[in-house]
Amino acid sequence: MQDEWQIAPRLSINGGVRLEWATEPEEKYGRDVALPNLTDRAPTIGRLYENPGVNVSPRGGFAWNVTGDGRTSLRGGYGLYYNTNNQQNLIVTITNPPFTPRPVIASPTFPNPPFNRAGATSIRPMQFDLEYPRVHVWNLSAQRELPWQTVATVSYAGSRGRHLLRSNDVNTALPTSLADGTPFFPAGTPRQNTAFSTIELKSSD
């Protein structure tokens, strides 16, 4: 929904709002796997994440004939835009246990087969309270008509992304500190959640 108003002979504004709804993906046979809390000892079979619901995208702008002669103008605008969840983040969840175990090899020494398994599997969950990525976009520009059919323009455009998607292992071991404050990982330091090896979380912070 969007409209424009001529609120004065030299000033017009426009504004609008867009409502967006993205449905939750579902595996045909109900084999979606989640890890609602990173401290859980086993994955949960069910929804991948909580749907954030309706996204509201406002936008607006203005155009001002500064001098009234049509030779100098000032324009500006702002908009908020959402993205959907990255499909790649959804696809990799099919490799999650218990339906598709992903064992991690602890000591792959070839002269000593079989490999020594670590005793824990890795998992690639979605952040359960996921927020959809969004970007705030704004701009401001001034134009002045010059002789010789020339127009001078000075513009500023900016944007800021929030809740951008990322992927990283959130189940790393916690370091200790040496006497000088240097972080140190002693050999054999366990991961934070010992039920899993890597927890490759697909998150939006």
Predicted segment positions?
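Short, intrinsically disordered, charge-balanced linker/junction segments flanking boundaries
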Residues: M1, R10, I199-D205
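Solvent-exposed loop/turn elements at secondary-structure boundaries
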Residues: K28-S57, G61-K202
